[in-house]
Amino acid sequence: MKKLIILLFCGASMLLYSQNINGRFSSSLYSFERYDAVNSSEKYIRAYEMLNLNFNYENISVRSFFNLEGNLSNKMEYDPRLRFYHLYFEARNILDLATIKLGRQPIINSVAGGIFDGASVHFKKNDYKFSAYYGANVPAYQKLEIIDDWSDNYLLGGRFTTTVLKDFQFTVAYINKNFKPQPYQAIRLLPDLVTNPILVDIENKSNQFEFITGEVFYTNKNLISVFTSYDYDLNFNQTSKFAVDARIQPIERLGINAYFNYRQPKIRYNSIFAVFDYANTYEVELGADYQISSGITVIGKFANVEYKDDNAQRLGVGLATQWGTLNYRKTFGYAGELDAVSVYSGYTFLEGLLTPSIGVSYTNYKLSPDDSESNNLTTLLAGVNIRPIRLLSFDLQAQYMDNKIYKNDFRLFFKLNYWFNINI
């Protein structure tokens, strides 16, 4: 209650001094059936109320994003639950150089993205950008609290980017994320394997991820683009990932893509899985797309993945048009066998007022090439988007799935969106 009163007081204060208030409100209903046992199931209707609310005064903003969720039937133990995803203060263009954020805010990072409670600063000058952040992990279920034991649950990092060379972008980044797991007890044998087992307290350290990342991006108008990234794991002292993604357009309407990556499994340093023996993978993918006309494009891709003692392949071909898409996908080898066909169509009528959509897919798969029996999966979806005015939309979608595990699985989703932008 105290937190709610403080929030209402802060909200009233921000309302008085704001020049602009904008954001989006969404209300959703999700209906599904959950099986608790072989012949026992319950039907649920779950509601989500989301609000993205921003108060703005010149170059200063307070941004928030939170969600209230709960069941309308068969209530769960923790219902209702309020999640705070964003709640931070932002000051932009300080001395035409810096932007500062303070509070619960998002972080975009290939190693450990998400949200955190803390501070970040962003500098931009000509062809140079630099950002740094420091804070703590968010409590479970995004509660409006500061996590206990900040020293063992923090993350810090930075990112430097420059475009000083024509057609190039260079980036160097660092992240250090700590998260201390809850201690627990386990039964262990003594080294002699004879003495009676003993109960041992297990308490791991907090160091989870520590990475250095390098990126190089090159583009030459519409002819060629190449993106290269490299991740080095400082905890394990080894390369975690190296990837190259390239695209070239040798002639008009034809594009050729090539992708390569070397990848180690991303294991938390303080996880029990860190002591296991694991191997890396190599992946190569080649693809092409050809634009037959202004509204029709043919796409094809083939990839090979090399594991320690085996390999797997995947093949995909498709047709993309202004009315929808048609795709076929096949995988074979160590990763399992799969044949899948999918068709999707969506089109807008009456100047955006009505957008119906429909899709169907059929999949035949084996989890292992040695399996004698294959499984079938059929999926259907149908939906409609209604936008009577630019700021208001309604979405309704029905999903149906059927295989030997989920028989006649039917789900229904409804969503209302309202955007607002008020100048005071």
Predicted features, each with a name:
Residues 76-139:
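Outer membrane beta-barrel
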